[in-house]
A protein has these predicted regions:
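Extended extracellular/luminal ectodomain segments enriched in beta-structured repeat modules
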Residues: 302-304
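Mature catalytic domains of secreted/periplasmic carbohydrate-active enzymes
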Residues: 1-288, 295, 299-300, 309
Length: 311
C-alpha cells in the first residue's frame, strides 16, 4: 500500500521548494516560506510504513518555454530533484494529458506538442532506473504499469496484463483499448485504475454530499482489483490541507467492508472440475492449493475451457 502525491499538476505549481522556478511553495505563507509538502508526506510515509510515490505532470501551463527543448530540460531537472531528495520512491506517475490552453508565462496561449517524441521519455526511464531502480513507472503505456483507459476506476472483465511493446505511449489516441490490454502483447504492463472518491479530482465544498459511498467503493474494488488491476483512489484535500471527514470515514469503512467480505476463502480445499487440463502437474487442484507457483493449464490445442466449483 502506498501514497502518490501530486507534486506538480498541469498548473505548474510545485509543492516542494524547487530551485528551478519561483512558482512553488517557497513563495507562499505556508510555514513562512519554509514548507515542503513533499518532504512532510515522505517523512510521514516512513513513520507509518507506507510506500511513497510522486505524480509529476509533464504538461506545464505556467512555464513560458513549454513546447521548446528548454522546457524538457527543466522538466528533467524537476524529476531529478524529486528522485534524489526524498528517499525511496515506489512509483513515478506521468499523466497523458499534454498540450493545450494555458497562461504560459502569463500570456494566454495554446501550445501543441508531439506527445510521442517531445518529452523523450526514454531519458526519463534511464534516469529513474539509475536513481530509483525499484520504482514502477506509470504512463498510458508503462513501462511499469499502465493507465486503464478511463478515470472511472474499473478495468475490463477481461483484462490482460500485456501490451504490444513500443506501441502505446503517453497520450496514446486509442486509449480505450487499455481497459482490456493486448491479448497478443509481449510486454508485462499491468493496469492501474485511477478514480476520485469525489466527482472530480479537486476539493469543492458543494460536493461534500457527493462522496462515493462504501457500497460504491466496494463495487469499484471488485471491478478493479477483481479484474486483474490495481486501484488508485484519489482524495482531494480540503482548504485546510486535510482529507474531509466524510471521505476519510467512507474510506475506512470501505476497507473494513472488504476485510469482512474476504475474510474466508470459500474455495480453499475444494477440488474443482475442469473440461481440460495438461496432466497432473497442471491440474485444477493447483487453483486452490494456496501456492502461487502452481497453476492450472490446458493442453496447447485447447483455447476454450471451463472450471467448475461445487460449494
Amino acid at each position: 500500500k502506498g501514497v502518490i502525491l501530486t507534486a506538480k499538476h498541469h498548473d505548474g505549481f510545485c509543492l516542494w521548494p524547487t530551485q528551478l522556478t519561483e512558482y512553488c511553495i517557497r513563495n507562499t505563507p505556508y510555514k513562512n516560506g519554509q514548507g515542503d509538502i513533499v518532504r512532510e508526506l515522505s517523512d510521514a510515509c516512513k513513520k507509518y510504513g507506507i510506500k511513497f510515490a510522486v505524480y509529476l505532470s509533464p504538461w506545464d501551463r505556467h512555464q513560458a518555454n513549454y513546447g521548446t527543448p528548454e522546457y524538457v530540460d527543466y522538466f528533467y531537472k524537476q524529476l531529478h530533484e524529486l528522485l534524489t531528495n526524498y528517499g525511496d520512491v515506489f512509483e513515478i506517475w506521468f499523466d497523458g494529458a499534454n498540450g493545450g490552453d494555458g497562461w504560459y508565462g502569463g500570456a494566454k496561449d495554446s501550445r501543441t506538442i508531439d506527445r510521442k517524441t517531445y518529452y523523450n521519455y526514454p531519458r526519463a526511464y534511464k534516469m529513474i532506473d539509475e536513481l530509483q531502480p525499484q520504482a514502477v513507472i506509470f504512463s498510458d503505456g508503462g513501462p511499469g504499469c499502465r493507465w486503464v483507459g478511463n478515470e472511472k476506476g474499473f478495468a475490463g472483465a477481461t483484462n490482460w496484463s500485456f501490451l504490444r511493446a513500443g506501441e502505446v505511449y503517453p497520450g496514446y489516441p486509442n486509449y480505450r483499448e487499455l481497459q482490456y490490454g493486448h491479448a497478443d502483447g509481449n510486454q508485462w504492463v499491468a493496469a492501474e485504475c485511477d478514480v476520485s472518491i469525489r466527482p472530480g479530482w479537486f476539493y469543492h465544498p458543494e460536493e461534500d454530499g457527493r462522496v462515493k459511498t462504501v457500497d460504491e467503493l466496494t463495487d469499484l474494488y471488485y471491478r478493479s482489483v477483481g479484474h486483474n488491476a490495481t486501484l488508485l483512489l484519489n482524495f482531494p484535500v480540503d482548504r485546510d490541507g486535510l482529507i474531509h471527514p466524510t471521505d476519510s470515514a467512507n474510506a475506512v469503512n470501505f476497507h473494513k467492508n472488504i476485510q469482512k467480505q474476504l475474510e474466508k476463502n470459500l474455495l480453499a480445499g475444494l477440488s474443482p472440475k475442469t473440461s481440460d487440463e495438461r496432466g497432473k502437474a497442471f491440474s485444477a487442484k493447483a487453483v486452490t492449493d494456496n501456492d502461487y507457483d502452481t497453476y492450472w493449464a490446458t493442453n496447447d490445442d485447447v483455447t476454450s475451457a471451463t472450471i467448475e466449483f461445487d460449494l
